[in-house]
Design a protein with these regions (language model features):
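A short acidic, Gly/Pro-enriched loop at the edge of an enzyme's catalytic core
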Residues: 74-87
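Conserved beta-strand signature within the Rossmann-like core of class I S-adenosyl-L-methionine
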Residues: 86-88, 111-128
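A short, conserved alpha-helix within the catalytic core of class I
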Residues: 91-108
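Short "lid" loop at the C-terminus of a central beta-strand within the Rossmann-like core
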Residues: 94, 124-130, 149-152
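Short, aromatic/basic amphipathic alpha-helical patches
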Residues: 132-140
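Class I S-adenosyl-L-methionine
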Residues: 144-207
């Protein structure tokens, strides 16, 4: 769980390790916790050192230090994504924007024999206007739903000034921060985009409710 990771990386035992020593400790840590049938993950990030670390720790099958906001995907990336069924982002929707998603969806669709775009699941902060991405996904034949049952705490505000800035933005969008941002945390919405021909008759709330995600 995330709590396990917070405890691990805040522990005194790891505090003074070099990058190489931490990597040597992380490799067996994650190997011993892998699911019996884990998904194969292709990762991309503009921070090439982060990608190298994830590869070294055994968290990625393939990784690419590329910035799709400023450059086109490499041929190696295009070749790696032919079997991708789900695109997700670990944070930063808003920094990672239309150009990146357009590049990635195009690369996957062109690499797949059926030419179809993959599913997309994201967790942008509530103050992000998601409509431009939803419109982009629609052009790839994807239907987008937003989870309505709950939001997800993302990170604490760094200070009162950041909190006040976000509250003003939310007020301008007509969003109620009570129990969410008012408590000192960014909150994120969950969006799921599916190919129209694969979209379940169940709502996104029903899909994720059955998985237990809404209880986390």
């Amino acid at each position: 769980t995330l709590d396990d990771l917070y405890a691990r990386y805040a522990s005194p035992e790891l505090a003074d390790l070099s990058t190489e020593e931490l990597l040597a400790a992380d490799r067996p840590f994650y190997a011993g916790r892998r699911h019996p049938s884990p998904p194969e993950i292709v990762g991309a990030d503009s921070a090439a050192n982060a990608v190298r670390y994830a590869l070294g720790a055994g968290l990625l099958e393939e990784g690419f230090g590329e910035n799709f906001e400023t450059t086109d995907p490499s041929e190696a990336f295009r070749e790696a994504v032919g079997d991708v069924g789900l695109v997700t982002v670990t944070g930063g929707v808003g920094y990672v924007w239309e150009r990146t998603f357009d590049h990635v969806l195009k690369a996957v669709a062109e690499a797949r024999p059926d030419g179809r775009a993959p599913w997309v699941a994201t967790l942008p902060a509530r103050l992000v206007d998601y409509e431009p991405l939803s419109d982009l996904f629609s052009g790839y034949g994807l239907v987008t739903q937003k989870l309505s049952a709950r939001t997800f705490p993302q990170r604490r505000f760094t200070d009162a000034a950041e909190r006040d800035h976000v509250l003003r933005q939310l007020a301008g969008m007509g969003l109620d921060p009570a129990g969410k941002e008012e408590e000192g945390w960014y909150h994120a919405d969950l969006y799921l985009s599916q190919p129209a021909g694969e979209a379940s008759k169940a709502s996104v709330d029903e899909l994720f409710g059955a998985s237990g995600l809404l209880d986390y």
